[in-house]
Amino acid sequence: MAPAGRGSLRAGLGVSLALFLSAGAGCRGPISAESEVSLRDSVRRALEMEIEKLDASREAQKLQRAAASEDLEIKPEYLAEIEASYDPFNYPSGVEKREILGEDLMGDPPKTVTVGLRHAIRSCVERNLTVQDATLGPAISEASVTAAESAFDWVFFSDLTWTDLDTPQAGPGFIPGLNEVQDSLQTVTSSTGFRRSLVTGGQFSASNEIVYSDVRQTSFGAVPSPNPGTSVDISFQLDQPLLRGFGSDVGLASVRLSRNAERAAIASLKSDLITTVTETESAYWDLVRAYRELSIVQAQLERGLGVREDIKARLVLDAVQAQVADAVATVETRKGDLLRAQRSMRRASDQLKALMNDPAFPVGSEVMLIPSDRAIDEPIVLSLVEEIRTAVENRPEIDTALLAIDDASIRETVAENGLLPQLDLRAQASLLGFDEYGDRAYSEIAENEFLDEFVLGLFFEQPIGNRGAEAEFRQRRLERMRSVISYRRAVQNTVLGVKNAVDDVKTNYRLIEQARATRIAAAEALRTLLVEKELTDRGFTVERLNLEFGQQDALAAAERAEVAALIDYNRAIARLAEATGTTLTRNRINFVVPDANQIEQRERSVSLTTGDAGSEGEDSDSQ
């Protein structure tokens, strides 16, 4: 929520390109040949240069892929059997067969919690430590803006001074023997007033000075009258630069830079949030992959155990000990693969727990997360040109680059003003009053009995050669040119990221069908081998049993490849949303930047409810 008075600052993070056209800069030639028109064109054409070769009129297309599995020409009844028995997504899960999960690090059977993708992302947005850290950035920058604006607040000042002077003086001379006299003076001075810095670069002050004096003089020294007396001075003073330092462009430069820093912090928060949500989604799909691969390895091991027993039974017929040992080695290798798969499952679970930071199952707990969502296999509609335009409109890096151009332009304006000589104006008017008592002195001011004081002055200063100011101006101009190049590079990197993401989505979608066809072919080969094994005597020869081992390995590899292709497709969709800056919209996340007060209230609320929330979540989701 935006603080009062700065709603427009947080209402929208996107920065209009037109805001920076007058301040843009490019670098295509010598500084002396660079014109403002070319600088504006350099910024305006940064996107058009990247997409001008593309056909913008082409409509978005739905992803397509060849039906490679149809080329296998497998009968429908056999295909149904394959899908029922050899589909890695239909194997018994870790919840149904808890023993395949192995032991946790404490040596106990793991306790499981089923987690969906939506819950994982919501927990990440609400609790992830990286997001919490980034959330503080805008609040810190907001305080910096307030501090910069406070430079133009009214300042109240008040001084009080007491002085007691005993000063020896020369004697009057006409009295023999009286060579010196002594003056005694006591004064109390009080000065009170207000002053304020102006956005034009000047300063205005209004002050009231009261001086109470009591003069005592020995011997024949004259004593003033009235004594003691009170003088009053009401003064108004304006100090205003006329050349260097003049104008709101210079006076408000620090405020504008602070506001841009706040916008940059908001863009950084959005970037961190997009990255963290994408990492969480990727970690969830990694968990799905590890979960399915664990089931694949377990199924492969169970098939291998059956073949090993068949080979052992052939010892009385045609098997030799070496063949039995080879079968045992194959099974033991698969047991090792199962241990590695269990470790991968634990690692993927812990990684997702770290990103979620859910108090119900912290990273240190031995609760194992079990994914409840399956990876999608549906085509999406894509248009490269529209994806690029969307990315340029939504990527926070583009906003940051535009803000850098504005910052450089502000600094260049200040440096250009610094080329001028210093010519300052001082105008002062005073109302004076004096009497024995202070109230009478103020009455004299009201009656205008004393002549008022007016001061008008000019102060001029100019460095010989002015090399320092010229060097700084040249530096700021070069920095502005660099900022435009950085903006163009940000656009280029964004376009490159979108193209790579679109390429990954299309390629991985096609790879799903290729991997599925490979898995179906491997499953058909193993199914045929098992049918021959049951119907003929040749199926139980040692050679055919070893061939069955090989077909099992081929099927497991094909199953893992299919799972990997499907997971990579879902991960590519998440990466595409990240590349286009639409991750938050895609996941229905409202991007609202909290202010410092909201953050403090939330932290107090979390500290009071963390313990209760953790125990409730674990009891409700445990398996």
Map each language-model feature to its residues:
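Acidic, low-complexity, intrinsically disordered peripheral segments
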Residues: G26-Y78, D166, D337-R340, D350-I380, ...
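Bacterial N-terminal signal peptides that target proteins for export
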Residues: A2-L13
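Small/polar, glycine/serine/threonine/aspartate-rich low-complexity segments that form flexible
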Residues: D108-T112, L160-F236, I370-V381, E412-N417, ...
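Hydrophobic, small-residue-rich alpha-helical packing segments that form membrane-like cores
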Residues: T230-L243, G247-D337, D350, L355
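Regulatory alphaC helix of protein kinase catalytic domains
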Residues: N90-S123
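Bacterial N-terminal signal peptides
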Residues: G12-A23
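A glycine-/polar-enriched beta->alpha junction
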Residues: E126-Q132, A139-W154, S191-T218, P224, ...
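Amphipathic alpha-helical coiled-coil segments
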Residues: A134, P138-A148, D272-A299, G306, ...
